[in-house]
Amino acid sequence: YRIEYNCNWIQVLDAIMDPVHTSFLHGQSSGIQFSKGFAEVGELEFFERGVQYLGCNTRRVDDYVWIRVNELILPNFTQAGSAFAADGTKTRYFGRSSFTRWVVPVDDNHCIALAWGNFGERGDPMEYNTKEGCERIESGEIMDRPWEERQKRPGDAEAVEGMGPITAHKGEHLMPTDYGIMIYRRRIRKLIKSLKEGKEPPQPQNKKGDTIKTNGQDTVLRVPKRNI
């Protein structure tokens, strides 16, 4: 499927490297768009591995610990965990991403997400393999809604487009939870500068034809709280 965004492509990439946004956008301000577990604000960790960037959010949901990993491989490959198959209430080992997508710039103010929905035992249920299902997985809400409804219950599309067609980073006030955004933006700037100097950007595989290992996923472990 494809989703067209009326904003710069970096704004869409920012969302994937801001794993805490799921707690506020998808679990609190707009109500429960996926599951109650998303509303929990977890412990964040970020990892930089070559041109791969991972944002890990570890939440406690009752007797379970839910580790969700968002993934960006530069310049534009993104994945996260599942949207509906994992809710932090049952054991799950390396459940795979609900979508695999390329975020492609059209111009400074527009971009397109070219995406594949992943359905089955390790992805989301087949019942979501519909146009509306893919939109809910991608943005938290279906996208063809009245303006008033989109303002009351915004999804990812409203969040990334709501900053305007192209944001000025100079006026931002980034927080510790935005560390993933900081490090990947810094790397993109360096790669652009190197490309202008004639240096080809690095590739995610060691040599042409190698399988690229990806890490977007959910793991849920039963770890009851200890009585202290």
Where are these regions (language model features)?
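C-terminal catalytic domain of Rieske-type non-heme iron oxygenases
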Residues: Y1-I228
